[in-house]
From Swiss-Prot:
It is a single-pass membrane protein. This is ATP synthase F(0) complex subunit 8. Pfam families: ATP-synt_8. Belongs to the ATPase protein 8 family. One of its GO terms (cellular component) is proton-transporting ATP synthase complex. The lineage of its organism: Eukaryota, Metazoa, Chordata, Craniata, Vertebrata. It is found in: Mitochondrion membrane. Component of the ATP synthase complex composed at least of ATP5F1A/subunit alpha, ATP5F1B/subunit beta, ATP5MC1/subunit c (homooctomer), MT-ATP6/subunit a, MT-ATP8/subunit 8, ATP5ME/subunit e, ATP5MF/subunit f, ATP5MG/subunit g, ATP5MK/subunit k, ATP5MJ/subunit j, ATP5F1C/subunit gamma, ATP5F1D/subunit delta, ATP5F1E/subunit epsilon, ATP5PF/subunit F6, ATP5PB/subunit b, ATP5PD/subunit d, ATP5PO/subunit OSCP.
Amino acid sequence: MPQLNPTPWFPIMMLSWLIFSLIIQPKLLLFTPTNPPSNKTTTTTRSNPWTWPWT
């Protein structure tokens, strides 16, 4: 079965990871989000208990 022979597939996998690591990843790390996170105060919501008619 030629699928089990790792000789042609291993260099292809290593080359693709090398391309990802050296070319694509630095470009992705330079990306700055359009909306930076802000420090907002959390508001607590108040819930009213429900009165069940059968209790």
